[in-house]
């Protein structure tokens, strides 16, 4: 029973460490297609074979950044080999995270609904 709680905590710690290390390693990339990228989260498979890295872009094109990051995944994984003290370093798969866009859209919809409600109550 005790091992069942340890494994998820270790996975969370490893994913957090990968998130921090990948963010630092991206700064070393010279690819002009990669704009200002923020690593939002990392999801790792239980066997540490694959990691989905979710990112957002402040400046630059999301599709170009995703392509460039996936092309640089081998370089970034090699950097993780040097930094992490685990037996298997996962293969990195980068995905653009649309959470911030969706949050802005929902916020705008809520604002519009509140404005309509205020207009309806005034009439």
UniProtKB/Swiss-Prot annotation:
Gene3D superfamilies: 3.30.300.20. Its main location: cytoplasm. Pfam families: RBFA. GO terms for biological process: maturation of SSU-rRNA. It comes from the Bacteria. Keywords: Cytoplasm, Ribosome biogenesis. One of its GO terms (molecular function) is ribosomal small subunit binding. It is found in: Cytoplasm. GO terms for cellular component: cytosol. Signal peptide: none annotated. One of several proteins that assist in the late maturation steps of the functional core of the 30S ribosomal subunit. Associates with free 30S ribosomal subunits (but not with 30S subunits that are part of 70S ribosomes or polysomes). Required for efficient processing of 16S rRNA. May interact with the 5'-terminal helix region of 16S rRNA. Belongs to the RbfA family. NCBIfam families: rbfA. Monomer. Binds 30S ribosomal subunits, but not 50S ribosomal subunits or 70S ribosomes. This is Ribosome-binding factor A. The gene is rbfA.
